[in-house]
From Swiss-Prot:
Assembly with partners or alone: Monomer.
PANTHER family in alphabetical order: TRNA 2-SELENOURIDINE SYNTHASE (PTHR30401:SF0)
Gene source species: Pseudomonas fluorescens (strain ATCC BAA-477 / NRRL B-23932 / Pf-5)
UniProt name for this protein: tRNA 2-selenouridine synthase
The UniProt record lists the keyword Transferase: yes
């Protein structure tokens, strides 16, 4: 019989395949990168067993569980677990605490002729390990923030650095009111877990100094871990600069051309209409901060640009609202932020200079 695995570091460093035997509702709240949910019980079955446990105790709940998962249902679930185990002989299974549910799955697999290891301590122990991983990195490593006006290409700079943490990538969101992607965001727990695994793997490769973008606490619906966000308030900063023309072009590419293509790839014929709706919604989100007259003017420019794009495929008219939004909203806001964080800025420059500086920078 295989021993339980409690080497959580090895599990995440090597991307060990795992099947999560918790109910779907638990899995949706938070899991780990690349894990497959193959539950012992459905949400409804779990709820009934939980109610029975509260009213009649553990033994009655176990009996009910075996009644609910029996016959053809039991055989189908064993087959799914067996298929996973055969496809991933180096894999593992787990439940919430490494308790009864994973023991039952392991036992039923054994009866089907397959010995398969469990994660000792289950989801809870692995989650604690990853939270500790982030805390330890904050205490032991060097961090620097990358700031800059909207559209300067901070994400592209991060993508060229081996020691970057792509917070927006892990959150699947570009970080602004216009940052939502065609695909949804992970749960907050999933976001935190992805970040922790990224930190773990980079530290294993010898990285001890990290670059990350200067972000608000919320990246869309994902909240930065509080210890990370708090530490970011005092970190040194590098400020990325670029011309207005380059910034407008980059925003046009990212938030119009590429985002539209994303929506079409995901939603097919409805893609453009959904993209247009999302763009207008994003502008409406900052209606109060823009003020009524300015919002209305930019809204009409955006509507006209979308109509032209729908008619001819030409995206050039989008430049008008992009330039207006930068000049009248984002740039003044970022100029204020730069002034307030000025004492923390240790270097500023355009792409090449910033890349060179960050690659050569010694930990502080």
């Amino acid at each position: 019989m295989p021993l339980d695995c409690t080497d959580y570091r090895e599990i995440f460093l090597n991307d060990r395949p795992m099947m999560d035997t918790r109910a779907p509702i638990e899995f949706t709240k938070g899991a780990f990168p690349g894990v497959l949910n193959l539950p012992l019980m459905t949400d409804q079955e779990r709820q009934r067993v939980g109610t029975c446990y509260k009213q009649q105790g553990q033994q009655a709940a176990i009996v009910l569980g075996h009644q609910l998962v029996s016959g053809a249902i039991k055989e189908q679930r064993i087959q799914a677990w067996a298929d996973f185990a055969r496809a991933h002989p180096d894999g593992l299974l787990y439940c919430f605490r490494g308790g009864l549910r994973s023991q039952i799955v392991q036992q039923w697999l054994r009866e089907a002729g397959i010995d398969y290891p469990r994660v000792g301590g289950g989801y809870k122990a692995m989650r604690t390990f990853l939270l500790d991983t982030t805390e330890q990195a904050l205490q032991q490593c060097d961090f620097v923030l990358l700031g800059g006006m909207t559209g300067t290409g901070k994400t592209q700079v991060l993508g060229q650095l081996d020691n970057a943490l792509d917070l927006e990538g892990h959150a699947n969101h570009r970080g602004s009111s216009f940052g939502r992607r065609a695909t949804g965001q992970p749960s907050n727990i999933d976001f935190e877990n992805r970040l922790a695994v990224d930190l773990l793997k980079k530290r294993e490769r010898g990285v001890q100094s990290f670059v990350l973008e200067d972000e608000n606490r919320m990246i869309g619906s994902c909240a930065l871990p509080l210890p990370l966000y708090q530490s970011m308030q005092g970190l040194p900063m590098v400020w990325l600069e670029d011309s207005l023309a380059n910034r407008v072009q980059r925003i046009l590419d990212d938030y119009v051309v590429n985002l539209c293509a994303e929506f079409v790839a995901v939603h097919g014929e409805q893609g453009f209409a959904l993209f247009a709706e999302r763009l207008l919604e994003s502008l409406n989100k900052i209606h109060k901060r823009l003020g009524g007259e300015r919002h209305q003017r930019l809204f009409l420019l955006m509507e006209a640009a979308l109509a032209e794009q729908a008619r001819s495929g030409d995206v050039e008219r989008h430049r008008a609202w992009i330039e207006g939004l930068l000049g009248e909203y984002y740039d003044p806001m970022y100029a204020f932020q730069r002034e307030s964080k000025g004492a923390r800025i240790e270097f500023s420059g355009e792409h090449g200079a910033v890349l060179d500086y960050l690659r050569q920078r010694s930990p502080r």
